[in-house]
Amino acid sequence: MKNPSYLCSIINLNLNKMNRKSIFRALAVVSVMLAASLSAQAQLYVSSQTGNNSNDGSKGAPLKNIQKAIDVASDNATIYVAEGNYYGTLNKGNINVTKPVKIMGGYKTDFSERDVLKYLTMVQPTPEANGTTEATGGTMTLKINTPNTEVVIDGLIFDRGNSISYNAKGDGKPAGVASPMMNPIGAAGIGGPELTTTNVLTKQTSMIYLNNSRCDITIRNCAFINGPNYAINGMFGGKKATITNNIFINIVMAACEISGGGMANETKEVHFTYNTVLFSWARTRDLGDMGYGYRYMTGNINHYVSNNIIGLSTFAGIDRTRSESDKTKDAARITTAENNIFFLNKQGDLTLPGGGMFMRVNVEDFADVDQLAKSGGNKSMADPKVFKGIINEPYLNGFLSASYKETATSDPNAPENKFRQAMGMNQTGTIQSSVSMYANRYPWKEALKFFGAMNGYGAQKIKN
């Protein structure tokens, strides 16, 4: 008979083998569970129609809101968004992107197919959201402080037309245009889809606001329609921002204005390519300042603008009036304009600093502009027939004839003026002002026709 201690060692060895196998099995199960969990965080699905924020965010159990998906996502996650309307949790009016993620819109409700212009993923706030939206930032605000990461916004349709205040008296409404003129910020008016909501107040925020994010940014295949205060605006602290294959229709101030942020010794780049920018309106209804398609801003940032269609601006298509305070830095700036089409910009295709008044430059003279490092291939198009059947003709006609006028009246025989005259004071009068059109609502579904309007220029057909 063998030594009992030997038998015990054999038993212990077998138990150890069993324990090892059990441990390995347990570790394998845990690894699979962890992988599944990480996968769920790295790929999230959102549907306003079938989702619930208590779901796990899988394709079969999507979340309801983009904001919720961002909140639970891991860094570098991809968020797939089905057709529907999304403007914040509880429809508050804001989406805050606080992590480097990719947001991909344009999916069918069951996520079996993607077609950005068929399965419309909207960011279209209501008038009610004006009361709850944050006062600063934008309808979507990018707040990412991690360098060497990227945010992608792809296939979203931003439209603020329903939440804007329009003139309740019907002033400034050319024949056939969808709405009266936009009210000044702070003036109550009508709004909503059918213009039946009263006491609407416009929120003066951008559509996408860059809150000095340190990540790289790509915005593509998106629509920006009826913006009361910029489409894309803010400070950029990453390395490269790419704004490509988008449409910007009926935007107040400017379609795109990005300044350099981040570290002062780091050079940033903006690439603005293959975009269609039409109907850029001035700051106010007197059609005075602003009203640009694209602005070359400062802050150690280079701008590359190419293959765009930029037209129908109340001031100019592109603006290069901003300069660095340090002349050496300003001389080192790179600003380009290549292979763009300009047409019917009211005061010029490009503005430059000059003698207390801005210089207005037409596209034919771009080669003489020292501030443009490259300026080849640009064209002027005087006749917008290429957009026949695409552009809203009543809106176009109203824009081309838009005008502002003031009428001053003063009655020297009025009692108050006789008194003021006797006292050696200036007499008073009244000024009546009127405008034929100002930032009226553009039909957002019609605006989507501009995708693919001209081969090689502006927004092209979307590759889903």
List the predicted regions and their residue ranges.
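Right-handed parallel beta-helix
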Residues: 105, 149-162, 179-196, 214-226, ...
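Short glycine/acidic-rich loop motifs that flank beta-strands on beta-rich extracellular proteins
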Residues: 90-92, 113, 127-128, 136-141, ...
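N-terminal extracellular ligand-recognition/capping segment immediately after the signal peptide
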Residues: 67, 75-102, 106-113, 140
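Bacterial Sec-dependent N-terminal signal peptides
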Residues: 1-43
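Right-handed parallel beta-helix/beta-spiral solenoid domain characteristic of secreted/periplasmic
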Residues: 100-195
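Right-handed parallel beta-helix/beta-solenoid
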Residues: 39-68, 85
